Amino acid sequence: MFDTVCSLPLSSDLFSQAIHPTEPLVSIGLSSGHVQTFHLPAPSENGKAGYGHIDTVWRTRRHKGSCRCVGFGIDGETLYSAGTDGWVKAARTETGRVEWKFAVPRIGDKSGFQVDSPCLIHALSPQTLLLATDSGALHLFDLRDRSTEVSARPQQTHHPHDDYVSSLTPLPPSETSTSGYSKQWITTGGTTIAVTDLRRGILVRSEDQGEELISSSYVTGLKAGGTSKGEKLVVGGASGVLTLWEKGAWDDQDERIIVDRSLDGGESLEVIANVPDELGKGKVVAVGQSDGRVQFVQLGPNKVISELSHDDLEGVVGLGFDVQGRMISGGGTVVKVWHEAISDEEGNDDESDEEDIENGEGLGKKRKGGNGSSDEEEDSDDDMAGKDKGKRKKRKRGKGKDRSGGVHVMAFKGLD
């Protein structure tokens, strides 16, 4: 069972959320262009993980337009962000200080170039950064080759789908891999999935699935037998259905699980996260929906075993589990932290102000007031910040926002 530790109100709509691979840190990108990093409480001496305060490590106006996507590097020391201002910036996770940046490749010709807004960023390895854009391009950047900030060019560019890339899931490295890093990944976009190789480019495109594919996750450790290898790709669609794809059989789906049975056709499944094995019964995925609910689906029996509500109106944009097994859900103007329930006590509500935090204060230290910035190039451009509502919100059915920031205690009946 899980309860909310707290609900953290945000100053503007959440566009992207990233969870640190080894530390209790969460970073977010907002529609206002701000990027903010939080430090979650460490386990207390009495063993109650997750109780305490969530501190702002740093907060800054990183992009002049909306911050579309954020993502940590493989080792967690670097936080990448990309915005509608056409810039990708790499900052130190601990301080927020920008170390280098480069321009998103533009589209058009000599008669007129325009920004191709980013929609997804992912560090595949210490050497390779993947960046997807609204035009459907998927760029590969070599992080070892840092040319001047304006002239940086991708090593490769692919167009795996007719539409923009809605999700990206790396495939596990092969048994013969010497680096230990993935060299292939699966993307969803439009009504298809595609498999791309670091060296050979696009390998496979699936058949048209007849519905928009939005989210994905890769699950290992399933029961093998017959043609099943015990590994499946889980894909979330716009009509409330999860599809399962057998490893290596990427041309068409293998199984279907109806997650949302709404009378109007089902809510779209915006984001998928694998529940840590120690928290679930068997293999379980958490699915964030456009109506603000999170549903938990057990693979094998292929059924929904529990659900909770992140928000009554706004959809779930970010979902994942931190290094201590706490679930982090984000959407609308709130981020919520959930821990495995120990008692019926409510978590403490963090009413921290939405102030700017100057870098260099260290993890977990909060400075109130001031207008410090961790990026010398940052300035205000409120007119640009409001132009990018459509991409993230186009599948949302609810309107309005939950401004209360109150604590909501929910239980997972199937996960205790």
Swiss-Prot record:
Keywords: Nucleus, Repeat, WD repeat. This is WD repeat-containing protein JIP5. Belongs to the WD repeat WDR55 family. The keyword Metal-binding does not apply. Residues 343-359, 374-383 have a biased composition (Acidic residues). It is found in: Nucleus, Nucleolus. InterPro entries: WD40/YVTN_repeat-like_dom_sf, WD40_repeat_dom_sf, WD40_rpt, WDR55_POC1. WD repeats lie at residues 9-48, 62-101, 112-151, 214-255, 264-308, 309-348. Residues 166-179 have a biased composition (Low complexity). It comes from the Eukaryota. Residues 389-400 have a biased composition (Basic residues). GO terms for cellular component: nucleolus. Residues 149-183, 343-416 are annotated as: Disordered. SMART domains: WD40.
